[in-house]
């Protein structure tokens, strides 16, 4: 087994350690959900994402974890990720159905399953909030995640239908413009004239 000298670690060990740290940190989710992100401005480089999209320390950490679990490097980090995300699954369902989805898999360490569960928890956390920005953005991001990670003949059709449903549900929200762009991008990829 590799020692504690990080300079001797291989990719698998590095990714495993990052995963452990995210799991440990996110195990304090109840505390993190109560910590306003603004209280940590002096520590964080938040970029250009409005605070309403990442209102708590939990949001900040979950979105970073989602970037990690969605990264292509994950594919080579484990002997196998037995979970295959089907386009026919609930990944493109309504937010309500997606949140209720119970994944039938024994592979609890799958990066895909970890990402799906984080999206479910994030959506559940924000579903009843006064400000819907964090919920709406997380919902659009999970649809994009589904498009990037799923397989199946109906992938494009299900993604386009989900984006259409999204824009109909949130017609006046700025994220609808992003959803329309994603829809147009899929059409362009299919050779449709726009």
Please name every model-derived segment.
Residues 1-194:
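Extracytoplasmic/secretory-pathway proteins
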